[in-house]
């Protein structure tokens, strides 16, 4: 029987779930995750306790609960459940209040009340920009890009660009390096004026072949020898042009994005 983990929040629960994943990944154990978002009333808090207690009876063991409930009364109700309750706000906010000698707002959903703010608009603009400049489909306004990701097809450029836009409000374009570029031995002409904004992604050739085979099985495009050729040529070009790059093979999107932000010295725009 897998241990049951509840993610309880008065909002979407994204913060609590991200934190829970980070903590639980330290243990060689699978868990059954139950998400309980929008617990924004006492009635919902009591209903949540019922769910938690039912799980404890069913599992024959206490559940684990990660909470980000701002309302203290709702929080106390949930803490009375038959579970190990890990209260992120009490753990972090109260020490900060003492250190800063300030009282926090204790307002529910404060972090998400940004629909009309400049940060939100910046993020939406960045997403639209990244979608419009995905896979080299548009060369217009490349000068507005914060970063332009380059690399062979299927090396992780698109998901990384969108993650940078959605999470950080970064205008991230991406542009493919193709065999014709390697034959010419130089960057595509559209990229040359923006050399200082380029960041490269590479990938293990064998892994690239596996990914491409899912898209075009048995094709030259996915053949191991072709993947080796493209990767070798792309990395040689990036070294020759002085472009910073990394291998995406064993890195998560989050790790790739964080590395890119550090390398290009971009401050995070949205939070």
From Swiss-Prot:
Swiss-Prot/TrEMBL keywords: Kinase, Nucleotide-binding, Serine/threonine-protein kinase, Transferase
Reaction catalysis annotation: [pyruvate, water dikinase] + ADP = [pyruvate, water dikinase]-phosphate + AMP + H(+); [pyruvate, water dikinase]-phosphate + phosphate + H(+) = [pyruvate, water dikinase] + diphosphate
Record-level Gene Ontology MF annotations: ADP binding; ATP binding; phosphotransferase activity, phosphate group as acceptor; protein serine/threonine kinase activity
Stored InterPro entries: Kinase-pyrophosphorylase, PSRP
Binding site for ADP: 151-158
UniProt signal peptide: none
Name of the top EC class for this enzyme: transferase
The keyword Iron-sulfur appears for this protein: no
EC nos: 2.7.11.33, 2.7.4.28
Highest taxon above the source species: Bacteria
Chain's role: Bifunctional serine/threonine kinase and phosphorylase involved in the regulation of the phosphoenolpyruvate synthase (PEPS) by catalyzing its phosphorylation/dephosphorylation.
HAMAP family the record matches: PSRP
The family this protein is said to belong to: Belongs to the pyruvate, phosphate/water dikinase regulatory protein family. PSRP subfamily.
Protein known as: Putative phosphoenolpyruvate synthase regulatory protein
Record organism: Burkholderia multivorans (strain ATCC 17616 / 249)
Organism ancestry: Bacteria, Pseudomonadati, Pseudomonadota, Betaproteobacteria, Burkholderiales
